[in-house]
């Protein structure tokens, strides 16, 4: 079985279907990208993996164990970390305090100092700004803090939801360079992103989601070069 596997997952808001029959796989060490328009079901998929939503029907397996019946905090304890869209920082806390909150799971608490140093090595700006209040950071700096906070949880699977949203092009490049470094360290990554070209160029494999369904899958370059993807998402 794959590192993470979704089997025919369906999620409803009341009686309205949000995702329908979603099946996808991620192997250990892969970076997998899900692309799609607003409302396609991408964030719902991440929230369901995280245990914030319950599939009905469908199954989610992580490291050969079924997790779709677990509450969200138990899913997080297994090493699944989600960095939400919009960063969701604690704005009146310092950078360091936000990072500490990321290390709440038992395994992360036990290795806090080493993990903090690893995060500072990856994102040296956070070390420089560690005593600065989070809401005074720029948008790009706040996104780096959100990524750093996620890494403090020592993720076995790191899920990023629209990390480049609302950022200037130069900051978008910086965010994707950071994701590339995380990938190179062997962390398994599930990336939801509307910046189609950047995300698929970086991905081992990609999925296209439309109207709550997976409509296309392949290697990152296969999906990027697909004629429908070029027309619908790249304007080519």
Segments and roles (model prediction):
Residues 154:
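Conserved catalytic motifs of ABC-family nucleotide-binding domains
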Residues 150-151:
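ABC ATPase C-loop
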Residues 35-37:
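The feature captures the beta-strand-to-loop junction immediately N-terminal to the Walker
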Residues 14, 32, 70, 95-114, ...:
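ABC-type ATPase nucleotide-binding domains, specifically the catalytic core motifs of the NBD
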Residues 58-66, 78, 112-116, 218:
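Conserved ABC transporter NBD signature motif
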Residues 133-137, 141:
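Conserved ABC ATPase signature
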Residues 50:
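Helix-to-loop junction immediately C-terminal to a conserved catalytic motif
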């Amino acid at each position: 079985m794959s590192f993470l596997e979704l089997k025919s997952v369906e999620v409803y808001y009341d009686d309205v279907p949000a995702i329908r029959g979603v099946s996808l796989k991620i192997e250990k060490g892969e970076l997998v990208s899900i692309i799609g328009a607003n409302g396609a079901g991408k964030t719902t998929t991440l929230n369901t993996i995280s245990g914030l939503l319950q599939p009905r029907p469908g199954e989610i397996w992580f490291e050969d164990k079924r997790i779709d019946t677990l509450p969200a905090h138990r899913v997080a304890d297994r090493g699944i970390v989600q960095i939400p869209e919009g960063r969701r920082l604690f704005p009146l806390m310092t950078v360091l305090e936000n990072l500490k909150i990321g290390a709440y799971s038992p395994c992360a608490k036990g290795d806090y100092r080493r993990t903090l140093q690893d995060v500072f090595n990856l994102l040296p700006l956070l070390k420089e700004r560690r005593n600065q209040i989070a809401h005074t950071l720029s948008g790009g700096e706040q996104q780096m803090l959100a990524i750093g906070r996620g890494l403090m949880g020592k993720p076995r699977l790191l899920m990023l939801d629209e990390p480049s949203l609302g950022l200037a092009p130069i900051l978008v490049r910086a965010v994707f360079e950071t994701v590339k470094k995380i990938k190179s360290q062997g962390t398994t990554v599930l990336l939801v992103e509307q910046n189609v070209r950047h995300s698929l160029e970086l991905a081992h494999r990609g999925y296209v989601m439309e109207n709550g369904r997976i409509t296309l899958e392949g290697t990152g370059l296969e999906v990027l070069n697909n004629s429908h993807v070029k027309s619908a998402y790249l304007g080519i």
